[in-house]
Amino acid sequence: MAQLYFKYGTMNSGKSIEILKVAHNYEEQGKPVLLMTSSLDTRAGVGTVASRIGMKAEAVAIDEEMSVFDYVNSLPAKPFCVLIDEAQFLNKKHVYDFARVVDELNVPVMAFGLKNDFRNELFEGSKYLLLLADKIEEIKTICWYCSKKATMVIRTIDGKPVYEGEQLQIGGNETYIPVCRKHYFKPEI
């Protein structure tokens, strides 16, 4: 029976490499997957899942208005699995649509993304995935400063921590740092 999975982690935890690994494993067995990502993530180009170690794959870009259930349901061949990168950028309707893909089409859905933002607040997509997912798994990484488990992210501008501002700002290593709770409140910057 298909399930909805949410695999979350901070920046640099290997979420994108994990999704690419899962896609490879399915496809190596001749089982096609549907790879999707948010159209908001433009770092490697719209509709591209890319890892920091250089691996990448083309994906269907999910925009704000897209009916993901209708899209998956209209495919001529049902995928063996739907894989979503940058799932934190999904909206409530997208998450409910993916739950329908699982429940009505019997297709497993694995969503990968951040849980909380630099203000330590849940992203909309993450909030609804935490509510609806059948299985939730943390992808772990270590604090930039002390090597404890990182559970939060600091946004930096010109090397200084920022705790206020717009939630959505697409960046990479130069903008976001994975940290433990202690170093979130007292970073060694």
UniProtKB/Swiss-Prot annotation:
Xref: InterPro entries: P-loop_NTPase, Thymidine_kinase, Thymidine_kinase_CS
Family from the record: Belongs to the thymidine kinase family.
Reactions that this protein is recorded to catalyse: thymidine + ATP = dTMP + ADP + H(+)
GO BP: any one term: DNA biosynthetic process
UniProt KW Nucleotide-binding keyword: yes
Principal subcellular localization: cytoplasm
Binding of ATP, residues: G9, T10, M11, N12, S13, G14, K15, S16, D85, E86, A87, Q88
Organism: Lactococcus lactis subsp. lactis (strain IL1403)
NCBIfam families from the UniProt entry: PRK04296.1-4, PRK04296.1-5
Binding site for Zn(2+): C143, C146, C180, H183
Keywords: ATP-binding, Cytoplasm, DNA synthesis, Kinase, Metal-binding, Nucleotide-binding, Transferase, Zinc
Compartment list: Cytoplasm
Active site residues according to the UniProt entry: E86
Alphabetized PANTHER family for the sequence: THYMIDINE KINASE (PTHR11441), THYMIDINE KINASE, CYTOSOLIC (PTHR11441:SF0)
Subunit structure: Homotetramer.
Protein name: Thymidine kinase
A GO cellular component annotation in the UniProt record: cytosol
PROSITE patterns registered for this protein in UniProt: TK_CELLULAR_TYPE
One example GO MF annotation: zinc ion binding
E.C. number(s) listed in UniProt: 2.7.1.21
Coiled-coil residue windows: none
Leader peptide range in chain numbering: none
Record's keyword annotation contains tRNA processing: no
